[in-house]
Amino acid sequence: MAYLKAYGNKRVYPNTEPMTVNTIFDMASCSKSMSTAICTHILAERGKLRLLDPVSLYIPEFKSWVSEDGKDKKIIRIADLLTHTSGLPPYAPTSELEKQYGSPSPDGMIEYIANCRRDFKPQTDFQYSCLNYITLQRIIETVSGQSLRDFARENLFDVLGMAHTDYLPCKRDKDGKWINTADAHWATSTEGDWHSLIAPTEKQSDGSVLCGQVHDPLARVMNSGISGNAGVFSCAEDIAVL
């Protein structure tokens, strides 16, 4: 890295704290390209899957696109998920899924995606979709036998020396407040609370602020913070490695 400098504030509520060059951010949808897509290609490179494989090879209940008259049918491939040409909807109704399946429920999330409407015939259009990358997460975990967090850590983040990059598992406590259920990878090298390095994202209705718990609702509520569409936390220096 040729130049690294911090500007502005990393926090303005309940107190103001300045940004530092070591501040760690919720990478949100950048998680797709920073982790999920790369992990998929790592498995392809190792011969564990093929990008032209049908998704149903790894998720048997995953339905194909079928025309309204039932006369035309087309499978959805891993490549279609990666390139947002699968026809899957952009997002899913988090509150409805939570009511139906409970929280967290990665299996419920996949059941919904496997059977939800397909907006268009695969490979005929483009539509950015978080559901594509949540589906890729399930494929990665099925093929590797590891959680996305563990696979990315062992095969990507550690390999590149990204010491301050991680997924941060979370859940609601008994009072409904979001808390982390495991330490961040950088916790042992941080004096005091490892959350102190993280830039918070959003004030909650109870006055608390999300800090270390992914902001994306599907990733947080349904997938406990480890999700193919969002969930990576990282800093500028680590991102520069990628």
Residue ranges and their predicted role:
Residues 1-27, 48, 65, 111-115:
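Short, conserved catalytic-motif segment at the N-terminal edge
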Residues 51-67, 158-160:
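Short, glycine/proline-biased beta-turn/loop segments that scaffold the active-site neighborhood
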Residues 26-52, 133-141, 239-242:
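Active-site SXXK
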Residues 7, 66-242:
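Short, surface-exposed loop or secondary-structure junction motifs
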